[in-house]
């Protein structure tokens, strides 16, 4: 039976699904011939590893670290939709600057767009950028093949010609319509309110950025940064 130390020098952790699989790899055919019991052979191998660097607990730790490294590597290899694109408009550059943060959950941006649809009707919407990134392919937008336009499924949609309006909650925001000064959006991640009234401050952890664009009549981006909760002990607030 081997002592198991060679697993770090040459063998890879992902070759073994469980610690028992690793123990089995240390058992030679001759061992099973004499012992005639695989479980006993495993116990003897495990006892022989007590003084080595690969006891069960260490194996599980290394296995978890290897899996975390694999997932992180896969995440890094996934390109952003804006990567490698020639961004000719301020609006596209602004979206590209915010893409990674909105994909990772560090930021939830709301995009206000006012423009015309294919019928020449003026339409506008408040768009949950993070939500759209997850549900749509943004490469055609960044490459200039398509324009990002308001949809009736966005947080808030309005057709100025027909006066048709629609409000929808998203995975990130709850729409609050019963407010005298206009629409409010409640972030589901931290429960903070984002105010899109241009005469008011946007709110805690939020900023308002008008964007001059040749592609649209009017564009404003509201960025809401998601603050991680502190580890400080405190009394929970009642709902």
Curated annotation (Swiss-Prot):
Keywords in alphabetical order: Cytoplasm, Nucleus
Keyword Nucleus recorded: yes
GO cellular component labels: cytoplasm; nucleus
Source species, domain of life: Eukaryota
InterPro entries associated with the record: DUF4464
Pfam assignment, any one: DUF4464
Subcellular compartments: Cytoplasm; Nucleus
Function: May be involved in spermatogenesis.
PANTHER family: CILIA- AND FLAGELLA-ASSOCIATED PROTEIN 299
Protein name in UniProt: Cilia- and flagella-associated protein 299
Organism per entry: Danio rerio (Zebrafish)
Lineage: Eukaryota, Metazoa, Chordata, Craniata, Vertebrata
